Amino acid sequence: AYKAAYLTSALVKLHASVEVVMTRNATEFIAPLTFEQLTGNKVMVDTFDRNFVHQVEHIALADRTDLVMIAPATANVCAKLAHGLADDMLTTTVLACTCPKLIAPAMNTHMYENPVTQDNLDILRRYGWEVIAPASGRLACGAVGAGKLPEPQDLLQYILREIAFPHDLKGK
């Protein structure tokens, strides 16, 4: 979870406007307050929060988003997005986004290598997502293998490349 905070900090230092959306499960790993302090923006978790500025906040957020980066992305989030399930603030917002999307899966090696997870990542690729391969090494569960979230500076390079080299002429 600390890597997401470091990535957020690096983006803010580059004067990016960063808005963080977290799942309820993500808040068990790192407090939303961490990201609020780093970005100066309210972290969005609850789709039905009555303190939003806009009546339909996930649509307003999707409309003003230039790039989506989901890091780390659990197998659950990958599956939801691959199959169009929108049952929380993250998935409803992202499904409404028309901007470029990056996703960095991070999970246990066996979960990552599971054919179902690989199929879901292939679906996301077909829908235009850039899937960032996980790093290998010692995982949070103690196992060693593929499944680690890449280092923040590596994730930042994907973001900068996407911003610097838009794919407007892709396929032409």
Question: Which ranges hold each PLM region?
Answer:
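A cross-family phosphate/adenosyl-ligand binding-site feature
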Residues: 1-102, 109-171
